[in-house]
Amino acid sequence: MSRAGSWDMDGLRADGGGAGGAPASSSSSSVAAAAASGQCRGFLSAPVFAGTHSGRAAAAAAAAAAAAAAASGFAYPGTSERTGSSSSSSSSAVVAARPEAPPAKECPAPTPAAAAAAPPSAPALGYGYHFGNGYYSCRMSHGVGLQQNALKSSPHASLGGFPVEKYMDVSGLASSSVPANEVPARAKEVSFYQGYTSPYQHVPGYIDMVSTFGSGEPRHEAYISMEGYQSWTLANGWNSQVYCTKDQPQGSHFWKSSFPGDVALNQPDMCVYRRGRKKRVPYTKLQLKELENEYAINKFINKDKRRRISAATNLSERQVTIWFQNRRVKDKKIVSKLKDTVS
């Protein structure tokens, strides 16, 4: 039998005892006296039933109990109904206080003046969720009006099952609100991966990839952290050449460091990126001798001759063609200088 049902049965027994003319017990009279003196029982205590000998005394006791309940802020429904029934007959028992439902204390609504004087609320916290096989990242930012004691007052606020205080930077924020011009907006990025029980924080300079989504699951847009990466690595690809020095130490790094505290590497010890032409490689004496002999025979070459020279000198056909072009330009410069000296 439920608690409400047991209370109803006790009320019926009290009504039957009052009709038979049984006198009220000492405990009932003491409870009625306590209610009359302004004391109120807690809402978790057992219900109190009082049998009275006269309707006027029952009405006075019920009124005193109702006044005490109103003064303490708790309302017990059903009291007015019992008091109305007690005034009809002097032999009927009256229930002084019968809690039918857990008492609820309503909070007063804020006045318009208080709402207007309230500071602007802080930006809402972005919560990340972990549905199925998906990967969801979230960004929590806090700025104006965020208080440290507000975080302490809500310890149950969580981010995917983890407390918000663990991943929010509250250093420098006092118990009072900080003006907007003194506190910059700070944020921490937290990511959740499939198969991991706890989130982790991002490290600048690393790319976060998205796990495979199953069929029927919505695909959400993920972000890629690109701090520390040069723009040319992705925009231009690897079409251009990258050159490194010959005697390169073991600890040299190619990527630029994204942490401001790191010491910059020396220029000769690191690889150099060049978008221009290749580094000039001088030809050997045998290659130059073969090219000079062919140039002395004919300053212009055809396709067959170019292929034969390329096979003999171990050079590409393009290198052979460019060498002949440069050799002709050199002859023109020599001739022009001779003319200038003669004139």
From Swiss-Prot:
One Pfam entry for this protein is HoxA13_N
Q: Where is the composition biased (Low complexity)?
A: 85-115
Under InterPro entries, the record lists: AP_axis_regulatory_Homeobox, HD, Homeobox_CS, Homeodomain-like_sf, HoxA13_N
Q: Cite the GO molecular-function annotations of the record.
A: chromatin binding; DNA binding; DNA-binding transcription activator activity, RNA polymerase II-specific; DNA-binding transcription factor activity; DNA-binding transcription factor activity, RNA polymerase II-specific; RNA polymerase II cis-regulatory region sequence-specific DNA binding; sequence-specific double-stranded DNA binding
Q: Which UniProt keywords apply?
A: Developmental protein, Disease variant, DNA-binding, Homeobox, Nucleus, Transcription, Transcription regulation
Q: Where in the cell is it found?
A: Nucleus
Q: Which GO terms describe its cellular component?
A: chromatin; nucleoplasm
The Swiss-Prot or TrEMBL record describes its family as follows:
Belongs to the Abd-B homeobox family.
The protein's matches in PANTHER family, at most eight in alphabetical order, are given as: HOMEOBOX PROTEIN HOX-D13, SEGMENTATION PROTEIN FUSHI TARAZU-LIKE PROTEIN
Q: Which disease appears in this protein's record?
A: Synpolydactyly 1: Limb malformation that shows a characteristic manifestation in both hands and feet. This condition is inherited as an autosomal dominant trait with reduced penetrance.
The name of this protein is Homeobox protein Hox-D13
The source organism is Homo sapiens (Human)
